[in-house]
């Protein structure tokens, strides 16, 4: 039987998203939200490497001691790109799955991709991972924190997609040669279906492949 899995994300909203997803698969999660909202999370991501490592390591150690956790599911793109989870995994002995693991496998399959992320920290981490895996890949990206804030407020997906002009953004990416649009923020599957109905650009969501890597 799988031991409880550390579920870490930037805010309570996206942390609960993956808690619910794992529960549907019969996996117990240990709730570990880093920040109370997206603005605080962005501030955390631009803090020093030492500060970020200390916070995450402490949460890992606490979950290990209380629940015997051996794995962590990091459900936040920008957090994954701004924290050295490989080093923390080595220090704590926790096996870590992040969206970046999926991107490493994804990159060689494409020549041109578009990425939408929560902020520039997230976009930079995704870009670095994709290009290390496929240096010939052409990338275009956008950081759209206002969309994350709208999701946190509970705005309806169809209204959100329209108000933030996401179909126009997707169509611009397509016109520039993008083969697919990568959802580079774990909040964004919230509007995936609504946007899919408004664009012909294929939309990539790393969540399902992350579950496979976790062994679910």
Regions found by a protein language model. Give the residues of each.
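Non-catalytic structural scaffold of enzyme domains
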Residues: 1-216
């Amino acid at each position: 039987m799988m031991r409880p899995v550390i579920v870490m994300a930037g805010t309570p909203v996206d942390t609960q998203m993956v808690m619910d997803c794992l529960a549907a698969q019969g996996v117990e999660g240990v709730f570990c939200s880093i920040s109370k909202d997206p603005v605080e999370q962005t501030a955390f991501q631009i803090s020093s490497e030492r500060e970020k490592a200390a916070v995450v390591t402490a949460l890992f150690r606490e979950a290990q001691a209380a629940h015997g956790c051996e794995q962590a599911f990091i459900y936040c793109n920008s957090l994954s790109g701004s924290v050295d989870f490989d080093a923390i995994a080595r220090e704590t002995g926790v096996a870590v799955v992040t969206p970046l693991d999926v991107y490493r496998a994804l990159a060689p399959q494409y020549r041109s991709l578009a990425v939408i992320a929560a902020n520039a920290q997230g976009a930079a981490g995704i870009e670095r991972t994709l290009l290390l895996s496929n240096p010939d890949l052409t990338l275009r990206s956008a950081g759209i924190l206002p969309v994350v804030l709208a999701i946190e407020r509970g705005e309806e997906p169809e209204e959100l997609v329209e108000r933030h002009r996401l179909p126009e953004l997707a169509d611009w990416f397509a016109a520039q040669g993008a083969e697919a649009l990568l959802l580079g923020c774990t909040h964004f599957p919230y509007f995936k279906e609504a946007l899919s109905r408004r664009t012909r650009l294929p939309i990539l969501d790393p969540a399902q492949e992350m579950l496979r890597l976790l062994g679910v």
